[in-house]
Protein backbone atom coordinates (compact mmCIF):
# COMPACT_ATOMS: atom_id res chain seq x y z
CA UNK A 1 0.00 0.00 0.00
CA UNK A 2 2.78 2.43 0.90
CA UNK A 3 4.59 1.70 -2.36
CA UNK A 4 1.52 2.57 -4.42
CA UNK A 5 1.13 5.90 -2.57
CA UNK A 6 4.75 6.77 -3.24
CA UNK A 7 4.32 5.79 -6.87
CA UNK A 8 1.20 7.96 -7.19
CA UNK A 9 3.04 10.91 -5.66
CA UNK A 10 5.99 10.51 -8.02
CA UNK A 11 3.92 9.88 -11.14
CA UNK A 12 3.29 13.59 -11.93
CA UNK A 13 7.00 14.33 -11.55
CA UNK A 14 7.84 11.54 -13.98
CA UNK A 15 5.48 12.78 -16.67
CA UNK A 16 5.92 16.51 -16.22
CA UNK A 17 8.10 18.03 -18.88
CA UNK A 18 11.24 20.06 -18.61
CA UNK A 19 12.03 23.10 -20.73
CA UNK A 20 15.64 24.18 -20.97
CA UNK A 21 16.96 27.14 -22.95
CA UNK A 22 20.59 27.76 -23.88
CA UNK A 23 21.80 30.75 -25.85
CA UNK A 24 24.72 31.58 -28.08
CA UNK A 25 26.48 34.93 -27.80
CA UNK A 26 24.34 37.82 -29.07
CA UNK A 27 25.73 39.67 -32.08
CA UNK A 28 25.18 43.16 -33.42
CA UNK A 29 24.89 43.54 -37.18
CA UNK A 30 26.93 46.55 -38.25
CA UNK A 31 26.79 47.93 -41.81
CA UNK A 32 30.01 47.81 -43.82
CA UNK A 33 29.39 51.28 -45.25
CA UNK A 34 28.59 54.61 -43.62
CA UNK A 35 24.96 54.22 -44.73
CA UNK A 36 22.48 52.68 -42.28
CA UNK A 37 21.77 48.98 -42.66
CA UNK A 38 18.97 48.25 -45.13
CA UNK A 39 16.53 46.16 -43.06
CA UNK A 40 14.59 44.95 -46.10
CA UNK A 41 17.78 43.61 -47.70
CA UNK A 42 18.88 42.11 -44.36
CA UNK A 43 15.56 40.33 -43.78
CA UNK A 44 15.43 39.12 -47.38
CA UNK A 45 18.97 37.73 -47.13
CA UNK A 46 18.24 36.17 -43.73
CA UNK A 47 15.03 34.60 -45.01
CA UNK A 48 16.77 33.09 -48.05
CA UNK A 49 19.77 31.86 -46.05
CA UNK A 50 17.89 30.29 -43.14
CA UNK A 51 15.12 28.83 -45.32
CA UNK A 52 17.82 27.09 -47.38
CA UNK A 53 19.29 25.79 -44.09
CA UNK A 54 15.96 24.16 -43.14
CA UNK A 55 14.41 26.82 -40.91
CA UNK A 56 10.82 28.08 -40.99
CA UNK A 57 11.01 31.89 -40.97
CA UNK A 58 8.65 34.80 -40.46
CA UNK A 59 9.04 38.53 -40.06
CA UNK A 60 6.73 40.82 -38.15
CA UNK A 61 6.25 44.23 -39.69
CA UNK A 62 4.68 45.86 -36.63
CA UNK A 63 7.65 45.06 -34.37
CA UNK A 64 10.29 44.94 -37.13
CA UNK A 65 11.74 41.66 -35.93
CA UNK A 66 12.59 38.45 -37.74
CA UNK A 67 12.38 34.88 -36.38
CA UNK A 68 13.35 31.46 -37.72
CA UNK A 69 12.89 28.03 -36.13
CA UNK A 70 14.46 24.67 -37.00
CA UNK A 71 13.74 21.31 -35.41
CA UNK A 72 17.00 19.65 -34.41
CA UNK A 73 15.59 16.58 -32.65
CA UNK A 74 12.04 15.27 -32.46
CA UNK A 75 11.67 12.02 -30.56
CA UNK A 76 8.73 10.86 -28.52
CA UNK A 77 10.04 11.98 -25.15
CA UNK A 78 12.11 15.01 -26.17
CA UNK A 79 12.17 17.78 -28.77
CA UNK A 80 14.96 20.24 -29.50
CA UNK A 81 14.81 23.23 -31.80
CA UNK A 82 17.01 26.19 -32.64
CA UNK A 83 15.61 29.70 -32.86
CA UNK A 84 17.30 32.60 -34.66
CA UNK A 85 15.95 36.11 -34.14
CA UNK A 86 16.89 39.55 -35.45
CA UNK A 87 15.65 42.46 -33.34
CA UNK A 88 15.85 46.18 -34.13
CA UNK A 89 18.59 48.00 -32.28
CA UNK A 90 17.87 50.29 -29.36
CA UNK A 91 17.07 53.87 -30.39
CA UNK A 92 17.57 53.13 -34.07
CA UNK A 93 20.90 51.41 -33.51
CA UNK A 94 22.23 48.34 -35.26
CA UNK A 95 20.07 45.19 -35.28
CA UNK A 96 20.76 42.41 -32.79
CA UNK A 97 21.14 38.76 -33.89
CA UNK A 98 20.22 36.26 -31.16
CA UNK A 99 20.11 32.46 -31.30
CA UNK A 100 18.84 29.99 -28.71
CA UNK A 101 18.33 26.26 -28.35
CA UNK A 102 15.08 25.04 -26.77
CA UNK A 103 14.93 21.56 -25.24
CA UNK A 104 11.48 20.38 -24.22
CA UNK A 105 10.51 16.99 -22.89
CA UNK A 106 11.29 14.44 -20.24
CA UNK A 107 15.09 14.75 -20.16
CA UNK A 108 16.13 16.79 -17.09
CA UNK A 109 18.47 19.75 -17.50
CA UNK A 110 21.26 17.94 -15.68
CA UNK A 111 21.69 15.76 -18.77
CA UNK A 112 21.58 18.59 -21.34
CA UNK A 113 24.50 20.87 -22.10
CA UNK A 114 24.04 24.50 -21.16
CA UNK A 115 26.51 25.48 -23.89
CA UNK A 116 25.17 26.28 -27.36
CA UNK A 117 26.83 27.54 -30.48
CA UNK A 118 24.77 27.65 -33.67
CA UNK A 119 26.93 26.89 -36.74
CA UNK A 120 24.17 28.25 -39.00
CA UNK A 121 24.50 31.69 -37.40
CA UNK A 122 28.28 31.67 -37.85
CA UNK A 123 27.75 30.75 -41.52
CA UNK A 124 25.14 33.52 -41.85
CA UNK A 125 27.62 36.06 -40.48
CA UNK A 126 30.16 34.91 -43.09
CA UNK A 127 27.45 35.17 -45.75
CA UNK A 128 26.59 38.75 -44.73
CA UNK A 129 30.24 39.78 -44.86
CA UNK A 130 30.75 38.20 -48.30
CA UNK A 131 27.60 39.92 -49.58
CA UNK A 132 28.97 43.21 -48.13
CA UNK A 133 25.73 43.79 -46.23
CA UNK A 134 26.97 43.73 -42.64
CA UNK A 135 29.52 42.37 -40.22
CA UNK A 136 28.63 40.48 -37.03
CA UNK A 137 30.23 41.64 -33.80
CA UNK A 138 29.75 40.11 -30.37
CA UNK A 139 27.38 42.29 -28.38
CA UNK A 140 28.70 43.55 -25.09
How would you describe each model-predicted region?
Residues 7-8, 93:
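A broad, structure-centric signal for solvent-exposed, well-ordered loop/edge residues
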Residues 19-140:
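Ser/Thr-rich, low-complexity intrinsically disordered terminal regions
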Residues 14-17:
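C-terminal motif of bacterial Sec signal peptides marking the signal peptidase cleavage site
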Residues 1-7:
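Bacterial N-terminal signal peptides that target proteins for export
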Amino acid sequence: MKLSKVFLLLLPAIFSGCTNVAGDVARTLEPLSADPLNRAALFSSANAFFTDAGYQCRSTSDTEDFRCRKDLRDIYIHQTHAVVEIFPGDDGGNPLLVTTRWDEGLIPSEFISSQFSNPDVAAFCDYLAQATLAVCRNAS
